[in-house]
């Protein structure tokens, strides 16, 4: 199989991923688990108290795979974000269905952590039209959103997770950032 490069943007920075096959993309959770577990412990619980009991509500993670809808773009490097979400959803038994916010969407639990998966059905450069309102609806701060997209600047054959960085001049992630700040979700 051809090598595929991708970036996963989130938590105030950029996580860059490179995967060599669809099977490896299916193991996305394994690669992200240490990062998410660390962030999960410090930022993900909201305490609810009442006179008789208290409980914690675990805030979900939103994983977004950027790509372009339509057969014309299937199996192209530009849709690696879609491929990553598809493989992750399949490996975790999460079904994706149409969502009112212009996305294919799924919800599930992975190792006790709630996850939301989204594939915006807008063109990539307009992905913020889907992701911004979706994150706002679920009241997710930006540090609970990870966005996977192709990255032509990444060399093939390298895997790098980086909690801080930029968006790699990627218009889809720029649109996402602008929409999120306009929705005041951070």
UniProtKB/Swiss-Prot annotation:
Primary location group: plastid
Keywords carried by this UniProt record? Chloroplast, Plastid, RNA-binding, Transit peptide, tRNA-binding
Where on the tree of life does the source sit, at the highest rank?
Answer: Eukaryota
One Pfam family linked to the record: Pept_tRNA_hydro
Transit peptide range is 1-49
Residue intervals passing through the bilayer: none
Q: Which InterPro entries match?
A: Pept_tRNA_hydro (IPR001328), Pept_tRNA_hydro_CS (IPR018171), Pept_tRNA_hydro_sf (IPR036416)
Gene Ontology molecular function, alphabetical: peptidyl-tRNA hydrolase activity; tRNA binding
Q: Which GO terms describe its cellular component?
A: chloroplast
Query: Which residues does the annotation list for site: Stabilizes the basic form of H active site to accept a proton?
Result: 150
Which NCBIfam families is this protein grouped with? pth (TIGR00447)
Q: What's this protein's name?
A: CRS2-like protein, chloroplastic
């Amino acid at each position: 199989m051809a090598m595929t490069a991708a970036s996963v943007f989130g938590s105030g920075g950029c996580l860059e991923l490179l995967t060599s096959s669809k099977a490896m993309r299916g193991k996305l959770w394994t690669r992200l688990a240490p990062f998410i577990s660390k962030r999960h412990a410090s930022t993900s619980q909201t305490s609810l108290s009442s006179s008789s009991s208290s409980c914690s509500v675990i805030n979900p993670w939103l994983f977004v795979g950027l790509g372009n809808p339509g057969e014309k773009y299937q199996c192209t490097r530009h849709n690696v974000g879609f491929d990553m979400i598809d493989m992750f959803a399949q490996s975790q038994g999460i079904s994706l269905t149409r969502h009112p916010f212009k996305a294919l969407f799924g919800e599930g639990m992975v190792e006790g952590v709630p996850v939301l998966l989204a594939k915006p059905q807008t063109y990539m450069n307009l992905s913020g039209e889907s992701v911004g309102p979706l994150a706002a609806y679920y009241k997710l701060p930006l540090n609970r959103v990870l966005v996977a997209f192709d990255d032509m600047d990444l060399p093939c054959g390298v895997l790098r997770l980086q909690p801080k960085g930029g968006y790699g001049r990627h218009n889809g992630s720029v649109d996402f950032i602008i929409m999120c700040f306009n929705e005041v979700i951070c």
